[in-house]
Curated annotation (Swiss-Prot):
Statement: the UniProt record of this protein carries the keyword Transmembrane: no
Protein's UniProt name: NACHT, LRR and PYD domains-containing protein 8
Protein family according to the UniProt entry: Belongs to the NLRP family.
Domain NACHT: 204-527
GO cellular component, as recorded: cytoplasm
Residues covered by region (Disordered): 1-23, 1029-1048
Principal location: cytoplasm
Positions contributing to ATP binding: 210-217
Family matches, as InterPro entries: DAPIN, DEATH-like_dom_sf, Leu-rich_rpt, LRR_dom_sf, NACHT_NTPase, NLRP_HD2, NLRP_innate_immun_reg, NOD1/2_WH
Highest taxon in the source lineage: Eukaryota
Species whose genome carries this gene: Homo sapiens
Record's compositionally biased regions (Low complexity): 11-23
Amino acid sequence: MSDVNPPSDTPIPFSSSSTHSSHIPPWTFSCYPGSPCENGVMLYMRNVSHEELQRFKQLLLTELSTGTMPITWDQVETASWAEVVHLLIERFPGRRAWDVTSNIFAIMNCDKMCVVVRREINAILPTLEPEDLNVGETQVNLEEGESGKIRRYKSNVMEKFFPIWDITTWPGNQRDFFYQGVHRHEEYLPCLLLPKRPQGRQPKTVAIQGAPGIGKTILAKKVMFEWARNKFYAHKRWCAFYFHCQEVNQTTDQSFSELIEQKWPGSQDLVSKIMSKPDQLLLLLDGFEELTSTLIDRLEDLSEDWRQKLPGSVLLSSLLSKTMLPEATLLIMIRFTSWQTCKPLLKCPSLVTLPGFNTMEKIKYFQMYFGHTEEGDQVLSFAMENTILFSMCRVPVVCWMVCSGLKQQMERGNNLTQSCPNATSVFVRYISSLFPTRAENFSRKIHQAQLEGLCHLAADSMWHRKWVLGKEDLEEAKLDQTGVTAFLGMSILRRIAGEEDHYVFTLVTFQEFFAALFYVLCFPQRLKNFHVLSHVNIQRLIASPRGSKSYLSHMGLFLFGFLNEACASAVEQSFQCKVSFGNKRKLLKVIPLLHKCDPPSPGSGVPQLFYCLHEIREEAFVSQALNDYHKVVLRIGNNKEVQVSAFCLKRCQYLHEVELTVTLNFMNVWKLSSSSHPGSEAPESNGLHRWWQDLCSVFATNDKLEVLTMTNSVLGPPFLKALAAALRHPQCKLQKLLLRRVNSTMLNQDLIGVLTGNQHLRYLEIQHVEVESKAVKLLCRVLRSPRCRLQCLRLEDCLATPRIWTDLGNNLQGNGHLKTLILRKNSLENCGAYYLSVAQLERLSIENCNLTQLTCESLASCLRQSKMLTHLSLAENALKDEGAKHIWNALPHLRCPLQRLVLRKCDLTFNCCQDMISALCKNKTLKSLDLSFNSLKDDGVILLCEALKNPDCTLQILELENCLFTSICCQAMASMLRKNQHLRHLDLSKNAIGVYGILTLCEAFSSQKKREEVIFCIPAWTRITSFSPTPHPPDFTGKSDCLSQINP
């Protein structure tokens, strides 16, 4: 489902001349998830120009000339940068590969590259694989006749695998089909065996995974073709063999050597020679989804003998697990759905994910299919407007199906918007076109029965994750041989080669389509006229497991698509059947229940339900389905997710809070799309901006939406401007804006200007952001404005200079509305006093901000002058006893009504307690004190208890979590509990007071019969209450951050 299109991966060449770039751009070291470069070593080599790489290889040959198995220029002349890295790691194990690389760059006068090489080796040296001084440099010694056989084998491989795709199978037998390669897959080819971090080891097993039809088999055949041309890792001198799993999994037992001999008839001696050097074997295994037997995962059942005749499942499992031929290199082509089956057998596999067509390749395919015509432009614009449909086109064969289906509609003169109201309807139009000529010989009743049987077969197999369908499956679905023959003729089903009674759906898309159709078919003559979806199966269809897409996601899309009334009408017309909306009513009952029981987890992307609702496209249905959505967490990474999110958010009537993570660089997409439509605005970029505006409009139209959190996000100027405009809209009722780990460029005039443009905004949080001077000046300006109604400002872990913090503190004075300021994990050092001087503040938190005992005197002085402060937290600063003494001395002389003081984790000891108890007895306003995580120990707590006995001490809440005291002080504490009439909450958790201490305190506690609302926390007993579970007063809530729970 995902269709993220990252920027081009084109290498940036460098030169060794004086004009060489001053640095290697950081992005050139990164790789997209699932790329063969991910976690690769020496990635900087891909930035080497062609001329420089050729020079590097010439110098490398000189280094290799002393080996027992020298490399020739013919073997490296066409080698890619990744193959050169592979050769380096292979011939120079451990750090020697980096030393040789650095030396060669030094000879080439590439000083900057030498620095980069040294930086990498220093980073990975601790985890690097130890040097093997006995590197095996052996090869198979072949006689002339044997070399000739290998040459003939390579010739046969080139003939067999060119063209790369098979024109005799679906959809190659369709006249308008044409093949277009996926450029990124071509780039992946030479990188498949790139050595990986952290050990710098060359992968011996590579699992190439991807969606059905994405191009795994084509890539495998491309590897074989390039190997036969000596263009794929030529320095390895491999013998490569491609096996479909059905070749291995025969009904009769066979040995692996016999499998090889089938490729080389009459070459038994040659096979034995090759098998004696298994490190020179390259084995490609494909077709796991068509296996009709189960893989074996019990090691004791496997075999290491390649001469032994074995059942197919044992032979295949022995190869996958490296029990047999552990030195051989394996390339495995596998679907996502087969990964869990194979994963337990594989040892240290390197995972490569094939992404399919990117946006540019999809556009190119449409343009090549339709030509550069007005009709082609209309179809392309229509497809790009439907982002779900366009994202499905990343699979090449699906892209062709969509083009073919839309072309049929254009040829009939149909309006695409009306005839194809959603993505599902495009597939309805195409797939139904396979039926008429072959179905017309059936009576209507037979046609209905055969269609039901096909749908039943598809549904059962989808629920059971079954791709190969046997005789029993056909019988269960009541699909007779006549129907099977008909569907084989339509290319909807395909018989597995060598398996007389086993079939697969020709395309998984067909299987998903007919499985969903099963639940909308109507049978008026029956008592129950439709097949009911169970509660569990509905949950499976709309689930988003761990943030990824379920293998049932397309089936779920098709189901909801069929339930769109216009699409349902197209189904009835195209398939000559009736449609039931019975499951539509059930969906409306089940969806709210699922959301209540299992709400989406943070970071899980866009919920699968949102895609399904976008596909049904019916206002009333969508609004009712989203009735219980009060908070939505979305991770948006592509244009499809923007469009779908906008559609659904606008229909969440009771939405209160939105959390957005925007991981797509909108500006890159804008430029990329525009470059494909020179002279005009690209449909995708135009649509993307429109959909983003649509999403932002939710803040202006939903008067219940009060909270927006932006996390890990980057927004280009046009998109940030659109968001800010929506937040400034007069109808926007947003009260809280939280910016966490966003790009610093987002703190610009547009977004900060929202503080004066929105009169409802009361809370602003900026967290984990580099705050630049320009942003602070803007913030200071709006904070001084009388139109700024902000009441609470939270700045956490913000990278800024001391001057910036000083300027901010000085500029807060002019804001009469700001009552709460939370500063956490910021390097304030000597700037803390500026914030205590802000006259209008009632609540101030300066936590973990590098305050020290040296700053406490100025802090205490400012505290004395404050008139409004009720809550102060200086938690997680190393104030020590000497610094805290200034705070204690200030408490009796305060002009402000301070009620809560938090000195949690401030490096205090029992030495500060004498000053503390004096202050507590003299200050009449302080009600709550948090001293947790300080080393008060028994002596300090005993002194504190003496103060609490004093009737002048009005403290109601005392928190002493993890203060390192024991049962020794419990007698004094019990005595205090008997006499103190004010204390309502006492936290003693994480202290080793033992059973004796607990019993002593419980006795004192239970003796206070008149005290009905005392709560205290002690070790082992989470909470003990006397008659009432009433929590401590809400005014004094909180642990380390006494202000974190404040609502605007």
